[in-house]
Structure formats: structure tokens, C-alpha cells
């Protein structure tokens, strides 16, 4: 049986992975559970791993994988959310493939996880993604990541990110941002008064700050695919 804090942490990790496609950082876990230090999170993570609910993968940032959920959490709505997502209408442009629960999404090109590069150019390729990875009823597309500025968020060079098309974002969302109408980048979004900060997840890079009118949100990260 899990303690209340262990349940809260597992719930938070699952919710953030459903939303962003990557686990939350230890700082985000600490804030979500209102703990004073990350050592408490380390203890909770270790307890969840020892009980077989999660698995930590070595030598990777934010490398947490959910192995199973307690029955109480399944009854509380995780299974219901899965059923609802599976029954939702297909996103515009998506094509059903033979693999159960999978969809083909257009692979629109490469996106910088580094300094901004030229705006995304679409191509004829597509990528197959789990249907459960798609959030809501909006249009989705995929991009190949170029660069290492988001590695602390678990996003590596060569990964495929799944993006839900939208023009707005909340603080902390990982977004595709179009800068000055011609440069695209994948960064964490922060609003600072009349300015927009695009934050990397790698200390080797600096946060980019632009006037609000120079930044257009093109979509939000909802999933990630990695080939080994």
C-alpha cells in the first residue's frame, strides 16, 4: 500500500506525462507536493521504484517510466480517460493505420532545441504515434528535434516530438515558438509582463527574451517518441 504522498507524487508524474509527454523535473515535483527540499522527492521516488510502480533509467535526464498504477488510481479515472481519448474524433489530417490505437501524423520537418533555426518546412513524411498520445480534439503534427537545449526536460537530439496545434500557452508549457515570423524553436514558455521568455532546459544555453509581438505560439508538446 502506498502512502498519501507516494500516491500524490505518482498521480502528478502520470498527469504531467499525459500532458507533456515527459516526466516533471524534481523541482516541479517538490513544488507540486509542497516539500521544502528535493531530498523528500528522492525518498518518494525510491519508495515507488522499490514497490514496482516506476522504473528509473540510468544515464538519462528525467528518466522515469511508469510501470503500473495502483488499482485505486485506475478506478479513480485513469482508465476512464484512456477510454475517452480512444473514442475521441481523429485529429484533422490523421490517418488510421493497422496497428491498434495508432495514428499517422505528418512529420513537418525539424525544430531547433538550441538556437532558433529557419521556420519549419513541411515534407511528405509521416510518423506513427500511439493514439493515446494525442490530447484533445485539435490538430496534431510531429517534428524531429535538432539540438540539445532541452535535455534536462528529457528531450534529446533526434527525438520526435508530438505537437498539438494551438496559438496560446500557459507559463511552463513546452511550445513550438515562431520568432519574428521566420525562426522556430522548441522551448519552455514564460510570460514576463510585455515580454516572452523562451527558456532552455540546459545550462549551456541562455534564456531568449523577446517582445510579446515577436513570438507566436505554434503548438504545445504533448508527446515524445525515441528510437533506440
From Swiss-Prot:
EC category name? hydrolase
Instruction: Give the GO terms filed under biological process for this record.
Output: DNA repair; DNA replication; negative regulation of DNA-templated transcription; proteolysis; SOS response
Q: Which domain of life is it from?
A: Bacteria
UniProt-listed Enzyme Commission number(s): 3.4.21.88
Checking InterPro entries in the record gives: LexA, LexA-like, LexA/Signal_pep-like_sf, LexA_DNA-bd_dom, LexA_repressor, Peptidase_S24_LexA, Peptidase_S24_S26A/B/C, WH-like_DNA-bd_sf
Q: Which Pfam families match?
A: LexA_DNA_bind, Peptidase_S24
Q: Give any GO molecular function from the UniProt entry.
A: serine-type endopeptidase activity
- Function of the molecule: Represses a number of genes involved in the response to DNA damage (SOS response), including recA and lexA. Has been shown to bind to the direct repeat sequence 5'-GTT-N(7)-GTTC-3'. In the presence of single-stranded DNA, RecA interacts with LexA causing an autocatalytic cleavage which disrupts the DNA-binding part of LexA, leading to derepression of the SOS regulon and eventually DNA repair.
Entry's PANTHER family? Answer: LEXA REPRESSOR (PTHR33516), LEXA REPRESSOR-RELATED (PTHR33516:SF2)
Q: How does it assemble?
A: Homodimer.
- Name used for this protein in its record: LexA repressor
The organism is Cereibacter sphaeroides (strain ATCC 17023 / DSM 158 / JCM 6121 / CCUG 31486 / LMG 2827 / NBRC 12203 / NCIMB 8253 / ATH 2.4.1.)
Whichever gene encodes this chain, its name is lexA
